[in-house]
Structures are given as C-alpha cells and as structure tokens.
Design a protein with these regions (language model features):
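C-terminal substrate-recognition regions of SAM-dependent nucleic acid methyltransferases
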Residues: 21-259
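Conserved Class I SAM-dependent methyltransferase catalytic core
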Residues: 1-21, 34-36, 205
C-alpha cells in the first residue's frame, strides 16, 4: 500500500465504501477502490488517501510536511511506575503487575489491581492520577516516589484526551478533553498533549483540540475508535504562546476562522 501511495503514476478513480454495491453478497471491510496507473503520466503521489475530495484539498494545503511540524510530536503516553522503589516497599505487587512484574505502565485497570492508589491525598507530594474505574473517570493519588518522574509532561501542564473515542466519523467531537496541572498524571486510558510551562498555553491547546479544523485533520487518519498518537500525524502543530499569530483569547468558533 505504501509503495502505491508513493507512486506518482498511480491514481484512484473511484472509491466505494459499501463493497456490496459492486460485489453482491460480498463483505469487504474498508470498501473497494478502482485505481489506474500510467507510467507515462505523473499525477503526483497520493501519500495519504481519503475518500473526500474537499478533505484531500485541505490536506494538501494544511497538513504538516514533516513530523516536526505535527502535533503528534507533542503527544505522550501514560505515566509509569518506578518499580524498584515500589517493590522495595510492596513486593506483593510484583505478582499482580503485568509481564511477570516488569510492566511499568499505568494500565487501564491499574486502580483495581494496585491498592497503593488512594482516593484521598495522603502526603503533600502525592501524584494525582486520572483514570477510569467502573466505567467512570476518577482521580486517585499515589506517592511520588513510586512514579517515574522523568516522564515528558508530568511536571508541566498538558491536555488529556481519551485514547478511545467515538466511531471514526470525520470531524467527530472528542470526549471531554481536560487540562491537567503539574504533578498530575494519567493512565493508559488517556494520551497527553503538550508539556507546557504555563497554564495559558495548555488552555490554548485545549481550544485548538476542540476546533473543527483540528478535528477534521485528525479525521484523516482516525478512521476507528482508536485515538492513538499516530492518528494525530496530519494535525499541524501550532504556537500556543502569547506570541502566536492566532488570537487564542477568542472563542473556539472564532479560532476556527483564523485557522
């Protein structure tokens, strides 16, 4: 597929999402494409295929030309345990943590598996962690010494977005993204966007994530519920500081007009 999409002599003539239109009583997930190749003509490499002409046009104008210009580069996965310190005080957890006790990651169900997490803060330096328990978002606390503090955004502001969201429809609204403060972490249920020194920049990033433009660009690669880091590759990175060409003090609708 990558070879064909990089071939300047290749083009798509027609896409049909419902394969049964062309092949009766046949289910082909993803649909059917009618393609054409002429070695004597150059149509320009497709790179990324979408079935929407308008979206193809937007993508050619606005999509990042390299990963450094993509919001994907500012997306970070869940926090992790400092297992050496955890097992020193609580060797019993080695039997319940995955990969025979070697899995550092705050997995989706970690609140149920490891009782070191508490509903109330026990000490001033405890890390507040956002996760899901019994199908509800909950905040729990864990002593800082049991958490790897080298994580990219643990000590800074960030925006959290659910790692599984919607159904993959183009431009669909993201499920309640939230701004998280320094010394607050998150489980595998979420991805973290940004690592900001000041709250204002995180709030600006939140507005961007809610914008129709951002959701449309996300929809280029997000075709399922999965909202992992790579699906954000076509979303352009923005300057979220006060020096930006975009006036972030405006409403999301007004920011969309600037984008």
């Amino acid at each position: 597929n990558e070879k064909m999409l990089s071939d300047p002599h290749f083009k798509v003539l027609h896409y049909e999402s419902d394969a049964s239109v062309m092949f009766t009583n046949t289910e082909i997930k993803g649909g059917v494409v009618i393609s054409y190749r002429d070695k004597n003509k150059s149509y320009g490499a497709i790179r990324v295929f979408t079935p929407y002409e308008e979206l193809n046009s937007i993508m050619k104008k606005a999509a990042p030309t390299n990963e450094a210009e993509s919001l994907m580069e500012n997306i970070y996965i869940q926090n992790k345990f400092d297992l050496e310190k955890l097992y020193k005080d609580h060797p019993e957890y080695r039997a319940v943590i995955g990969s025979e006790g070697r899995d550092k990651r705050f997995r989706n169900n970690i609140f149920e598996k490891v009782s070191i997490f508490t509903e109330e803060r026990q000490n001033k330096g405890d890390i507040r962690v956002l996760g899901v328990s019994k199908n509800k978002r909950v905040w729990m606390y864990i002593p800082e010494k049991y958490v790897e503090t080298e994580h990219e955004n643990l000590k800074n502001w960030k925006v959290l977005v659910a790692r599984v969201n919607g159904s993959g429809n183009l431009g669909e609204v993201l499920s309640t993204p939230v701004v998280e403060a320094p010394n607050e972490g998150y489980t595998q249920t979420f991805i973290g966007i940004g690592s900001f020194k000041v709250e204002a920049e995180a709030q600006n990033a939140l507005k961007y994530i809610k914008s129709k433009f951002c959701r449309t660009m996300l929809g280029i690669l997000k075709i399922t519920q999965d909202n992992n880091r790579d699906t954000w590759r076509m979303v352009p990175l923005q300057d979220f500081t006060a020096h930006s060409d975009i006036d972030w003090s405006k409403s999301v609708a007004e920011i969309d007009q600037q984008l």
